[in-house]
Amino acid sequence: MGNDKTNMFVAIGLSLLVLLGWQYFVAGPRMEQQRQIEAQNKAAQQQPPGVTPDGVPSPSPKEGGPAAPAPGTLPTAQGGPVSREAALARSPRVRIETPALSGSIALKGGRVDDVSLKNYHETIDPKSPEIVLFSPAGTETPYYAEFGWVGANAGPLPTNDTLWTSDGKTLSPGMPVTLTWDNGAGLVFKRIIAVDDKYMFTIRDEVENKGSGAITLYPYSLVSRWGKPHTQGYYVLHEGMIGYLGNDGLQEFTYDKLAKEGAYGGANTKGKAWTGVTGGFVGITDKYWAAAAIPDQDTPYTGAFTDRTDGATNVYQASVRGDAVNLAAGASATATQRLFAGAKEVNVINNYEKDLGIKHFDLMIDWGWFFFITKPMFRALDFFYHLFGNFGVSILVVTFCLKLLFLPIANRSYVSMAKMKAVQPEMAAIRERYKDDRMKQQQATMELYKKEKINPVAGCWPVLIQIPVFFALYKVLFITIEMRHAPFFGWIRDLAAPDPTSIVNLFGLLPFPAPDFVHLGVWPIIMGITMFVQMKMNPAPPDPVQAQIFTFMPIVFTFMLGSFPAGLVIYWAWNNTLSVIQQYVIMRRNGVKVELWDNLRSTFRRGNGTKAAATKS
């Protein structure tokens, strides 16, 4: 095979390694730095409106409204954090029971502060604890949603210490509950809470002014999280504050980025607000779970992200505050908002966007810049999953379909490679004839390519096509909850996690765990073997250095993919296998000898010769 072709293959392999490293070590940090610079520049040009000490945007002076009191404060737990059970026992509660959720609403404060996901567990063991999303104040990591009204001239308003009464003991789909509180000064508050069979709460706050004077109130809702959680994104997906704020579009702030924002409102508080927003949502997102405050999609509001330092703890908050509601004596007002608290299931998120009209709610799932590849990839995998009932089988079928889709391109590539093999004797003669003149050798080679209608870089297309598919599948496996704990066959019980076996302990035969830094399971080894076989379908490069690179490349990729999700490794091994079969058929059809076995024999013969030489010396 000619030097041009071998050089190109070497470049492709090394480029893939460089691309992976560049994405992780350079592109991610550079993008984060650029976002911070843009945020700082924009903050310098715009003075944000005031906020309460807890991050709920208070009316700015230009609105002519009063300063707002401080909702959302957390009572300090005497003696430090307490157990979850002890914290839950501090308040009477309304139980939450749905097909997807369990938990409770605290009547003291009227918060949704106890939510567990019934269909998701911490590990692949179905008996392991359920995922806990919300936890009440007083625990080690409080995380809750709060709703209500703020205002300065309205007298006592509901706070986190307000004890509400409830007309029911259990909140379930089709069975809402109504919370009531009378402030004793002419205002009666009602909160009607409903929930569907998935993860959406609907909260309707009503207030009736039985007093003699007019008042002005502002409805608000917020999601508050105490303490910085462990993030898993590694620049592959966003975790932290997220929102779609009307014309300002998608806004994403990592926890570290939010801490670098300018001072915002109250003491020890940093953050950013957007005023005059219509449509969208604000919230806090993890890899698989999220909580979002969703205002009425047709009513203007102010959205904000804040980071308040409370001693040694950071309090992260995403909040919305509606415009002023002027309430005359004898009048009443209603504010309806929603709360999403649950798993980021693709179809559920999309249905909420469509059925409830939540603008761009699908952005809650981070499909990345190449969403136009990632989304169709997930759709295809999901379609075949519902057909076969196994995401691993779905990966195999989608890979096969992609092979069929790109069959014309691959055929042209392999036909060109077959022709190139057929002219190997002529190319060898050219190298011998012009061995002292590199330029003439290249000119004669290109004339031969032109005469035989050979494209010297045609063999690159199968590899180039595989790269975007590889990254799209990696993204899908990493971000979508549907892939979490999705089993294959045998020992693969989670396609989104690395192969749990390891060659270090002989795949579990030896009684000790394998170290993480040498994680090399069965499937990465299978992938390495298929890659080795695929490379041996072609003759070895004449350059000894290039031949060594080609020999060690499968080994490098085997170790590199050892810590990658098993689903990705299975895809690569299956794709290599299909490529070998396809190349074999095309070569035989074009009358070209398949040199696989000859190349394998020569490889091991060289290895034995090297050992023999070393022994003699």
UniProtKB/Swiss-Prot annotation:
Any single biological process term in GO: protein transport
Keywords: Cell inner membrane, Cell membrane, Chaperone, Membrane, Protein transport, Transmembrane, Transmembrane helix, Transport
GO MF: membrane insertase activity
Region spans: Disordered: 36-91
Localization terms from the record: Cell inner membrane
Membrane-spanning residues: 8-28, 387-407, 461-481, 517-533, 549-569
Major place of residence: membrane
GO cellular component: plasma membrane
Keyword Nucleotidyltransferase attached: no
Xref: Pfam families: 60KD_IMP (PF02096), YidC_periplas (PF14849)
InterPro entries, per the entry: Membr_insert_YidC, Membr_insert_YidC_N, YidC/ALB3/OXA1/COX18, YidC/Oxa/ALB_C, YidC_ALB_C, YidC_periplasmic_sf
S-S bonds: none
Superkingdom of origin: Bacteria
Composition skew (Polar residues), residue ranges: 36-49
Topology class, membrane: Multi-pass membrane protein
Segments of skewed composition (Low complexity): 61-81
Membership in a protein family: Belongs to the OXA1/ALB3/YidC family. Type 1 subfamily.
Assembly and interaction partners: Interacts with the Sec translocase complex via SecD. Specifically interacts with transmembrane segments of nascent integral membrane proteins during membrane integration.
Function of the molecule: Required for the insertion and/or proper folding and/or complex formation of integral membrane proteins into the membrane. Involved in integration of membrane proteins that insert both dependently and independently of the Sec translocase complex, as well as at least some lipoproteins. Aids folding of multispanning membrane proteins.
Name the UniProt record assigns to this protein: Membrane protein insertase YidC
Name of encoding gene: yidC
